């Protein structure tokens, strides 16, 4: 008997798109339901990439009749960041210790239920209660800031003004931090205005912040109200015993539990000078969502010392 060649789920969709389209009225009438079912072929391919490399990945794609759905950059990320897994739950409550600003290979953070390494999580828990009491009944108010060529570093000015407004608490999450001027703004707020600063950084880009800190010859003991944590993104566990942790690709700031500033910017000179970004300022009850996200990231974070 002739063996039937498998056709992958994505491959079938691509081939279907090559067929001449029906009139719009016919398509609207016969519109198929959105298929959100699991694609086992892509899972097998990803697991094979993690455990056996590009060769095994291509082999599974050919066997399953599926298209190559990963970009070259994504493949490199899988190969460089895949790790052996003990199949333990990432949120197992284990003590992960702390990272050092001087260490070259920071440990992989786990995800305890509540972080007891610093007061950042508890501070935000208290702040969340404050915002629930003070602004839950308020309507959300959103203001959008877009990049404009006639206002140099406009988004950076917005961020700096937002930092300056903080009186008691400033919680920050960012994927990339290399801007010395913004670091000075934060340290001045912490040391001179006694604002509690809680900074969470992406674990893979932590070395960028560490290098800046060391280059400036700063000492953590001189800034007791300034805490730094690192955190991973989601963790994918392959059935073949490998795992892959993602990155934090979000940036937002919360000041005094009253306002949140979020957007596509990073804390870097390139972000302000040449990259096109946007930001939006949120007030009212919607700030609660940012506080809850900060608490989730805090519970999975690893403190950085140095």
Task: Locate predicted features.
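Structural motif
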Residues: 168-171, 259
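Cysteine/selenocysteine-centered motifs that mediate thiol-based redox chemistry or coordinate metal-sulfur cofactors
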Residues: 289-306
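Hydrophobic pocket-lining residues within nucleotide cofactor-binding pockets
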Residues: 177
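Short catalytic-loop micro-motif centered on adjacent basic/acidic residues
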Residues: 170-174, 199-200
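Secondary-structure "cap/kink" motif recognition
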Residues: 162-167
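Amphipathic alpha-helical interface segments within eukaryotic helical scaffold
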Residues: 171-172, 181-193
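HKD-type phospholipase D/PLD-like phosphodiesterase module
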Residues: 1-161, 180, 184, 196-259, ...
